[in-house]
Amino acid sequence: MEYQVKIEAFEGPLDLLLHLINRLEIDIYDIPVAKITEQYLLYVHTMRELELDVASEYLVMAATLLSIKSRMLLPKQEEELFDEEFLEEEEDPREELIEKLIEYRKYKSAAQNLKEREEERQKAFAKPPSDLSDYAKEIKLSEQKLSVTVYDMLGAFQKVLNRKKINRPSETRISRQEIPIEERMTQIVDCLKSSRKRMHFMELFPYEQKEHLVVTFLAILELMKNQLIIIEQEHNFSDIYITGSEAIHDA
């Protein structure tokens, strides 16, 4: 399968690390490196399993995390344990990474604040100097806000893979039949149009074959990017539901 999807929501490895820190409710000043490294590598592995274009900077960050983890696991010399001067001068291997994360979080928050201000400003119109109502056009502002991130979608897909792995029999017959992304997109759209109600994310993965699971997930991302479906999540880390947009039902 030679299909690749580029997702704009992937802003870089620091963005992924912040997502994991928030998800796991970790103190950014005291990061458990072993745990965060495991979760980070799982996400990168999932991206590569989906044949997404994983930028080299993600792999560099993975190597950095592994390096920090190994440095923290190295045993200290016995004489160093009682050397107060050594303890004062010893640097935390996580220090540089923590500083980068805090700096990135600050700029990310500022960028989000500016974006929200821009959206609010677009909803306001200055009073015209004269009556131009005859020439005014009605402008419909879009109120749709995507609250579900690609990282949330990846997390949901990981649950699908884990559940299918548990339910899969010990011996399976692998089918090499390739499924075009466009065909699976059409199937999902038809399913949403016929149901006329929201569907649970898991409902779109009825088959066990890995190829079919990957194609289905990529099809969902494409439909999401093209605003043909609406992704809903009541609160963080809850179940994800999918409904067809007006564009689907009006077609």
Swiss-Prot record:
This is Segregation and condensation protein A. The lineage of its organism: Bacteria, Bacillati, Bacillota, Bacilli, Bacillales. Keywords: Cell cycle, Cell division, Chromosome partition, Cytoplasm. Pfam families: SMC_ScpA. GO terms for cellular component: cytoplasm. PANTHER family: SEGREGATION AND CONDENSATION PROTEIN A (PTHR33969:SF2). It comes from Bacillus licheniformis (strain ATCC 14580 / DSM 13 / JCM 2505 / CCUG 7422 / NBRC 12200 / NCIMB 9375 / NCTC 10341 / NRRL NRS-1264 / Gibson 46). Component of a cohesin-like complex composed of ScpA, ScpB and the Smc homodimer, in which ScpA and ScpB bind to the head domain of Smc. The presence of the three proteins is required for the association of the complex with DNA. The keyword Cell cycle applies. Participates in chromosomal partition during cell division. May act via the formation of a condensin-like complex containing Smc and ScpB that pull DNA away from mid-cell into both cell halves. It comes from the Bacteria. InterPro entries: ScpA, ScpA-like_C. Its main location: cytoplasm. It is found in: Cytoplasm. GO terms for biological process: cell division; chromosome segregation; DNA replication. Belongs to the ScpA family.
